[in-house]
From Swiss-Prot:
Cofactor: record remark: Binds 1 Mg(2+) ion per subunit.
Protein name according to UniProt: Phosphoribosyl-AMP cyclohydrolase
SUPFAM superfamilies per UniProt: HisI-like (SSF141734)
Protein species of origin: Methanosarcina acetivorans (strain ATCC 35395 / DSM 2834 / JCM 12185 / C2A)
UniProt-annotated binding residues for Zn(2+): C76, C92, C99
Gene: hisI
Compartments it resides in: Cytoplasm
Length: 120
């Protein structure tokens, strides 16, 4: 296993791209600190660092829409990670399967899978 200390964190954070393991759809991007990455490796459930709340969070802890991590890949520069996951429910807090549910024109192109008001 790659030593987590050899990764290139910027201000203690590393970018994490989350992708569905089977469909390869990009679900979201978030940041991880070393603790979030360690917890993800240990538990098999995605954990991230909230820059706004300044705290660790387990993806899906409130909604139940967990990300079961099947594989973690490191990019060539060692400054970002790719989580290949089995997504339970939606990844986006707006109710969509992916956070990338709109195109640049503003049109909704993604699948809505839950109503946020029913979950949060």
């Amino acid at each position: 296993m790659i030593d987590l200390d050899t990764l290139k964190y910027e201000n203690g954070l590393i970018l994490a791209v989350v992708q569905d393991q089977k469909s390869r759809e990009v679900l979201m991007c978030a940041y991880m600190n070393r603790e979030a990455l360690e917890k993800t490796v240990k538990t098999g459930i995605a954990h991230f660092w909230s820059r706004s709340r300044k705290q660790l969070w387990k993806k899906g802890e409130t909604s139940g829409h967990l990300q079961k991590v099947k594989e973690i890949r490191i990019d060539c520069d060692m400054d970002s990670v790719l989580l290949l996951v089995e997504q339970v429910g939606g990844a986006c807090h707006m109710g969509y399967r992916s956070c990338f549910y709109r195109n640049l024109k503003g049109e909704v192109v993604g699948e809505k899978v839950f109503e946020p008001k029913d979950v949060y």
